[in-house]
């Protein structure tokens, strides 16, 4: 009886651990915005003790010579804080991802180890001033690290 009780306790402990892990907030969130720019993302950075990593990704569908020859994509990125302060920067995203005959996909690290100066929801807006024909949109992946 004693041995059965310890197995039962162990099983209950495993179930409790699995439930606790499954109830946590996700550590990574991805979103793709298609259509016309600007591509706007809302990012919850309510935990100022955590750091956040950001990746950008995109897909371009066009003629083979355009897809093949595109080396980088010029992006104008604006960050707006919860208190409505805006920071702007120009970024050149390398287009070194997967290439097929009429399509090119790219994913690149954007910022690593970001610790927000303010807790809350930040807005990231992306414009593509020299967008190639066939740009399908922009994606943002946010990873939270403790």
Stretches with model-predicted labels:
Residues 67-75:
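Short coil-to-beta strand junction motifs in C2/discoidin
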Residues 19-22:
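C-terminal motif of bacterial Sec signal peptides marking the signal peptidase cleavage site
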Residues 89-116:
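An anionic, turn-rich surface loop/hairpin at beta-sheet edges
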Residues 132-142:
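Edge beta-strands of jelly-roll/beta-sandwich modules across compartments, strongly enriched
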Residues 24-26:
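Bacterial signal peptide processing site
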Residues 49-56, 114-129:
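Noncatalytic modules at the cell exterior or secretory-pathway interfaces
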Residues 57-67:
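Short amphipathic, basic-aromatic surface patches that mediate peripheral association
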């Amino acid at each position: 009886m004693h041995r059965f009780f310890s197995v039962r306790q162990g099983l209950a402990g495993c179930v409790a651990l699995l439930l606790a892990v499954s109830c946590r907030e996700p550590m990574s969130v991805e979103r793709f915005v298609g259509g016309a720019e600007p591509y706007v993302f809302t990012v919850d950075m309510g935990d100022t003790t955590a750091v956040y990593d950001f990746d950008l990704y995109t897909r371009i569908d066009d003629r083979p010579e355009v897809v093949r020859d595109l080396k980088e994509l010029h992006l104008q990125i604006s960050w707006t804080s919860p208190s409505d302060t805006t920071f702007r920067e120009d970024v050149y995203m390398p287009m070194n991802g997967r290439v097929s005959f009429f399509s090119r996909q790219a994913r690149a690290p954007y910022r690593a180890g970001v610790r927000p100066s303010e807790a809350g929801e930040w807005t990231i807006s992306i414009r593509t001033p020299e967008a190639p024909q066939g740009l399908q949109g922009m994606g943002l992946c946010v990873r939270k690290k403790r």
